[in-house]
Amino acid sequence: MYNMRRLSLSPTFSMGFHLLVTVSLLFSHVDHVIAETEMEGEGNETGECTGSYYCKKGVILPIWEPQDPSFGDKIARATVYFVAMVYMFLGVSIIADRFMSSIEVITSQEKEITIKKPNGETTKTTVRIWNETVSNLTLMALGSSAPEILLSVIEVCGHNFTAGDLGPSTIVGSAAFNMFIIIALCVYVVPDGETRKIKHLRVFFVTAAWSIFAYTWLYIILSVISPGVVEVWEGLLTFFFFPICVVFAWVADRRLLFYKYVYKRYRAGKQRGMIIEHEGDRPSSKTEIEMDGKVVNSHVENFLDGALVLEVDERDQDDEEARREMARILKELKQKHPDKEIEQLIELANYQVLSQQQKSRAFYRIQATRLMTGAGNILKRHAADQARKAVSMHEVNTEVTENDPVSKIFFEQGTYQCLENCGTVALTIIRRGGDLTNTVFVDFRTEDGTANAGSDYEFTEGTVVFKPGDTQKEIRVGIIDDDIFEEDENFLVHLSNVKVSSEASEDGILEANHVSTLACLGSPSTATVTIFDDDHAGIFTFEEPVTHVSESIGIMEVKVLRTSGARGNVIVPYKTIEGTARGGGEDFEDTCGELEFQNDEIVKTISVKVIDDEEYEKNKTFFLEIGEPRLVEMSEKKALLLNELGGFTITGKYLFGQPVFRKVHAREHPILSTVITIADEYDDKQPLTSKEEEERRIAEMGRPILGEHTKLEVIIEESYEFKSTVDKLIKKTNLALVVGTNSWREQFIEAITVSAGEDDDDDECGEEKLPSCFDYVMHFLTVFWKVLFAFVPPTEYWNGWACFIVSILMIGLLTAFIGDLASHFGCTIGLKDSVTAVVFVALGTSVPDTFASKVAATQDQYADASIGNVTGSNAVNVFLGIGVAWSIAAIYHAANGEQFKVSPGTLAFSVTLFTIFAFINVGVLLYRRRPEIGGELGGPRTAKLLTSCLFVLLWLLYIFFSSLEAYCHIKGF
């Protein structure tokens, strides 16, 4: 009805939960009746064994008078307290969402380091400032356990520094819930046949050992060292175990104890930004790498310190690997959805990469909270927002270009080419933007380059007038032809002195100081005109020796230029040659053929098909080569009689292996052009006359030849657009950007917006899903908290620390209300604080973690995010929650000459029971790593069901025996 699939748990968990609530409520009333009958013989002892119906004043909430209401009023009061407590739990979950967002931003901070290789080459890369293990045990654990920790501290400080049952029992109860129920759920929800293993097993061993030690330590200080009294040194040592635990976990993560005595070498990996660690004997040669001025080698003390965290082991995902993965995803999406726009492909790729990316505990906690409160799937919302921003930015840029208020005047091209015999060359001037109703004037003037005015071209200057509505004008410059062999020459044409005329101006032309606001020169404002000589058959060459092409170009076109003349028809052969790039359709398609230049034709193109592999990085080469040019219709025994006077042109015939020329009409001294055939019996050995020598020299000067660049190296590179898209996506797939906020406006919009939750089909290509009924219900239930906590500073400020500080203060305030409500709820129905804490408060504070672990178990590749942090969080709860509270209270009482007394009974019994069950839990998890199951989570259905049932049973037994001890049915310590 309410789309409850989003909150569905295992049947085992649901059954256990309902059984627990029923048993607890019945238990409380039975215990109360039994305790009353026992009171007559047991005197004051029973005061600790029964739940009191008389409430005490809370830290914030007063007592609800009268103290002895009727049965109906008790039900009403209990309902009010329970509903208020649940509503406060919702508020804590939402502010904890902000809190975890700030932690994600803080722990995602990076720093740039410089790596200097042995050859002197330097590269830059980024590393995270926070070590993953350290952040998980400090900020992450604090974020997920803040309510329990603060409840313990506030309870002690708010009740005149006396020990209470609510805080410590909540911590122990929460630990039991995390250890048994959450892990049972994670084992069960993994799809049948799939497994999840803990990747960092060393860290798990250390945190599990510290977790069990933490609760063993509580028993020792309560029942062994100083029974019933917590001394100052015990409280402080409990607190200082926290940093010691963090250091031990960090040492295990960094492998610093045993590995310190193994020589380590570091080398730069083949991929940029990657540092690879080696272990073994010390080499004889010096192969050190410097990073930030430090020589990286094992004999350098304290290199791997906490300030500079180098990701050198196998757990780190290299930036280049991430980019290649993004490139692969984009390629697959293009093939799968060829009809989609690039913005849609970016959205799909962004969501897919974010879904597959390894995520922190904070992210899963945030995701779970937002799904529960109708805030939607954070990944899909982020991907859609990024795509919309990309489209809007494109529209804005287009609009700005089209609506530019200033008219730009510029040449259509920066370079123009023409033949010497063309007569005139035309240059186009463009007017773009601004008010087209104005009249714009612009001057132009030619300037000598290697070509000279008067002998090569006609000097030209003047003014171009753009009338209202005109956007394009043409100017012409005369070109002077001659019969002299010469190099290609060029001259310049400049635009200057833009003026604007409008009806508003009195004299018709605006003053110069106002022109720039209406019209100005654009780029290019200078054009270069190259004159190709037409008195020669031509020199054939590529434009440059090397060219770079994108693999996405499809068909690449390479120009072959004909310079220093363009007379006659010439054939130029060409072919491709393999280099590191392979032909045959692997990297390019083999191409060969001939280019035929017609008379006066100065450029031809060669087309080669390049294969698009859509690689993020590519650098392969092949070559394109042109052969010796030859004239069309060659004959070895033909020649042309040349006169001393007049012009000539190529006939396509050869004399003594050289081109034969003929006279050209309409020259200075025109004569008839006649082709003369030399007799076959002509003797090649006969001495040439001086006239024939001159003819031969001229023929030699005019034959087609190869130029400087006859072999072009083609370098195939990755697509710039494709690489740019990947780089942008890589930046957008930072989870800190996904969960963080940049402004209060963004937070308030998010607070009042209802979004669709998770989809079962996960149809990434479907239309955007509408919110369900459940999403609307949860949104309206939590909208007050969402709007209230939208006032918390965005994570953009102070790199997340402003949000961190304000959020933890808000959590503390709500936790104080929860403590009072839980205590009053318990006393109203006759439950002891210890039972209320273990059952209700621990459950309420652990619900977001439960769903976070469920999502992590199904989506993550490893089990670390779902259960790996449970053990560390349990240890941190004791060391911070109980350590801080008891240290403060012990110091306060010691300063007053008193002792800080803590009853060891219920707490010590619960701790001992939890420790025994925790050993069983860890043992079962380690056994599941055997090949027949394959991992801590998942596996065959039977194994999953048995494991989940066992863990749920352990939790029920823990609750059952703790309640029996609390009500004195069994003897504790």
UniProtKB/Swiss-Prot annotation:
Domain text: The cytoplasmic Calx-beta domains bind the regulatory Ca(2+). The first Calx-beta domain can bind up to four Ca(2+) ions. The second domain can bind another two Ca(2+) ions that are essential for calcium-regulated ion exchange.
Tissue/organ expression: Detected primarily in heart and at lower levels in brain. Expressed in cardiac sarcolemma, brain, kidney, liver, pancreas, skeletal muscle, placenta and lung.
Annotated positions binding Ca(2+) 4: 456, 482, 486, 489
Topological category with respect to the lipid bilayer: Multi-pass membrane protein
Domain of life of the native organism: Eukaryota
Alpha- repeat boundaries on the chain: 141-181, 842-878
Protein name (record): Sodium/calcium exchanger 1
Residues bearing attached sugar chains per UniProt: 44, 160
Cytoplasmic topological domain: 96-136, 192-204, 253-800, 846-874, 928-944
Catalysed reaction, written as an equation: Ca(2+)(in) + 3 Na(+)(out) = Ca(2+)(out) + 3 Na(+)(in)
